[in-house]
Amino acid sequence: MTDTHSIAQPFEAEVSPANNRQLTVSYASRYPDYSRIPAITLKGQWLEAAGFATGTVVDVKVMEGCIVLTAQPPAAAESELMQSLRQVCKLSARKQRQVQEFIGVIAGKQKVA
């Protein structure tokens, strides 16, 4: 008699067969000795549809017989204020003091002499 824990449960595949891709590992030539190194090239509109638009940072995990590519979320854009602060940091000490005084005047903490 079959044990209840050994009965296969029906399940849906995580990846539909229409989304499967097959490719062959090719090679790239390395200068100066022109030795062949393994290379995998991925290209196609399906990459963008899968979340891998041009410029996307990709995390690569490598295991025996398995490579997992994960698209990283875009970094939060730096605020305009932080960009300005970075520019002020590059100024001379005298100009930095002028900026601080200006901020003080705008904030109402100081009065113009």
UniProtKB/Swiss-Prot annotation:
One family name in Pfam for this protein: SymE_toxin
Which InterPro entries does this UniProt record tie to the protein?
SpoVT-AbrB_dom, Toxin_SymE-like, TypeI_TA_SymE
Q: Top EC class per UniProt?
A: hydrolase
A GO biological process of this protein is: RNA metabolic process
EC identifiers of the protein: 3.1.-.-
Q: In the record, what terms sit under GO molecular function?
A: DNA binding; RNA binding; RNA endonuclease activity
Q: Where in the cell is it found?
A: Cytoplasm
Q: Where mainly found?
A: cytoplasm
Tell me which residues make up the SpoVT-AbrB domain: 29-74
Q: Which GO terms describe its cellular component?
A: cytoplasm
Q: Sorted alphabetically, which keywords does the UniProt record give?
A: Cytoplasm, DNA-binding, Endonuclease, Hydrolase, Nuclease, RNA-binding
Q: What does this protein do?
A: Involved in the degradation and recycling of damaged RNA. It is itself a target for degradation by the ATP-dependent protease Lon.
Q: Return the HAMAP family for the record.
A: Endoribonucl_SymE (MF_01193)
Belongs to which family? Answer: Belongs to the SymE family.
Q: What is the name of this protein?
A: Endoribonuclease SymE
Q: What is the lineage of its organism?
A: Bacteria, Pseudomonadati, Pseudomonadota, Gammaproteobacteria, Enterobacterales
